[in-house]
Amino acid sequence: IKTPSTEDALSWLSEFTEEEAKMSLSLTDNCPILAKEYLRTNTIQTREDFINDISGIIKSGKDIVTISKKWIEDLDTLPMKVEWMVKILYDTIKFHADDSLQKLTEDTDNISRYLSQNTHIEKVHNLLAQTYATWTQFSSDSNLNKEYQLNSLFIDWEKLLGISKKV
């Protein structure tokens, strides 16, 4: 099945603001059914909160324990947030490989670009593997302690990205 044009998708999402519709289409790779679900379930606000949290961790070493507890309180969105972390790292690798790229994921490009310029790429690759492994555990609904796993992941981000040295 062919993905509809952006105009058709925006028309289908006309009950929402154009800005919201474009953002949700961007987050869902132009999949209007999923975009509508994102808009109905307030996933856009979850995304904004995620960006604030993750950029705080990356740029200023924001309290990872507090953020971890906050994320654990909403287990339904946890796999999605970790998937978004994976996407940031993918984009970081792409920006590092080709600095002429203008745009990948509009709302997190600044984070990915920052990481591509301030972190050794080997560390990003290692962190990507660890983040993806954590996402797999959360997505498969394993019986491992999710709070422990998330804290461990945030500590890996801190260590491998050198955040604590910047604070």
Please describe what each predicted stretch is.
Residues 1-84, 88-167:
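Charged, glycine-rich active-site and insertion segments that engage polyanionic ligands
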